């Protein structure tokens, strides 16, 4: 059974196509490889969060190692 958890998006590396996620409660950090298109979308998501003074969170499937939409 897959378990989805909320992780905070720390950083988006568009050069390496990686999304860096953190779960502070459990001191976990994860780097997820994504496509070039997804990296651009997550970078835009981060910019929008900064503009609205919000913290960007995503659902992350720990078992499959994927960010869920």
UniProtKB/Swiss-Prot annotation:
Keywords: Plasmid. It comes from the Bacteria. Pfam families: DUF5511 (PF17630). InterPro entries: DUF5511. This is Uncharacterized protein pXO2-82/BXB0112/GBAA_pXO2_0112. It comes from Bacillus anthracis.
């Amino acid at each position: 059974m897959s378990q989805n958890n909320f992780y905070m998006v720390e950083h988006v590396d568009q050069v390496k196509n990686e999304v860096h996620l953190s779960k502070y409660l459990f001191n976990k950090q994860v780097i997820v490889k994504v496509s070039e298109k997804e990296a651009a979308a997550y970078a835009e998501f981060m910019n929008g969060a900064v503009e609205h003074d919000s913290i960007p969170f995503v659902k992350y499937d720990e078992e499959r190692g994927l960010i869920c939409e």
